[in-house]
Amino acid sequence: MSTIRPVFYVSDGTGITAETIGHSLLTQFSGFNFVTDRMSFIDDADKARDAALRARAAGERYQVRPVVVNSCVDPQLSMILAESGALMLDVFAPFIEPLERELNAPRHSRVGRAHGMVDFETYHRRINAMNFALSHDDGIALNYDEADVILVAVSRAGKTPTCIYLALHYGIRAANYPLTEEDLESERLPPRLRNYRSKLFGLTIDPERLQQIRQERRANSRYSAAETCRREVATAERMFQMERIPTLSTTNTSIEEISSKVLSTLGLQREMF
């Protein structure tokens, strides 16, 4: 049996929902080479027919039944997509009818609700949070009064991508502070952070993994030396423990998992956008 399986994320909007759910499902299966393709804004019959033809062609090319993860809200478009002969995984259909019965109300199909700019205030909050994260990245700005969270870690431990994810997906004003050699020498919380203890969250990382990351940025330097990485990580972890700062290792942890842990630990209640 071929291990190659074509998978299509089809949506009448951005395709983010279909791809996110589809990716989560596919990660439950090992030993397969999933060839994925996102088809966004499939919002009329002609586009749906073209999408169905692409899926069918992929099935013929690989001699295997394709998979379509579908988040189109229009049932007619879903019916056209099914003509591809693919295994259809409908993101919404299994849940809409039970909800209609429970709420005693019909759905109002609207394209792009999940990731469109339906609520301007919410969208504005996301943009402001993103601007905040960028302007408070790597200690650029040190005015933390408006921050919801301040990530603290040695250089290249995952602070920046986590802050950006928190801003984009939760509207969290996330700043980050890089621990310098001077900070680590004292093994005490840097003075500029002491008034914000309740907002602090420490990130740590396996020294060997940190060295790999730093080598990509500045190879064969003191910054990326194995001893430097071991010393910085060990000192930062002692500081976090001494100052009772909640911590999490980013070594084998996804940005999504890190973000969820930060939110739950600090008690930040935000809906995902």
Swiss-Prot record:
Q: Name one Pfam family in it.
A: Kinase-PPPase
**What catalytic activity is recorded?**
[pyruvate, water dikinase] + ADP = [pyruvate, water dikinase]-phosphate + AMP + H(+); [pyruvate, water dikinase]-phosphate + phosphate + H(+) = [pyruvate, water dikinase] + diphosphate
Does the keyword section mention Glycoprotein? no
| Matching InterPro entries | Kinase-pyrophosphorylase, PSRP
Reported EC number(s) for this entry are 2.7.11.33, 2.7.4.28
| Kinase is among the record's keywords | yes
> Which positions bind ADP?
153-160
Question: Which keywords does the record carry?
Answer: Kinase, Nucleotide-binding, Serine/threonine-protein kinase, Transferase
Q: Name one GO molecular function term.
A: ATP binding
Under which main EC class is this enzyme filed? transferase
Function comment: Bifunctional serine/threonine kinase and phosphorylase involved in the regulation of the phosphoenolpyruvate synthase (PEPS) by catalyzing its phosphorylation/dephosphorylation.
Q: Which family does this protein fall into?
A: Belongs to the pyruvate, phosphate/water dikinase regulatory protein family. PSRP subfamily.
Per its UniProt record, what NCBIfam families does this chain match?
A: PRK05339.1
Instruction: State the name under which the record lists this protein.
Output: Putative phosphoenolpyruvate synthase regulatory protein
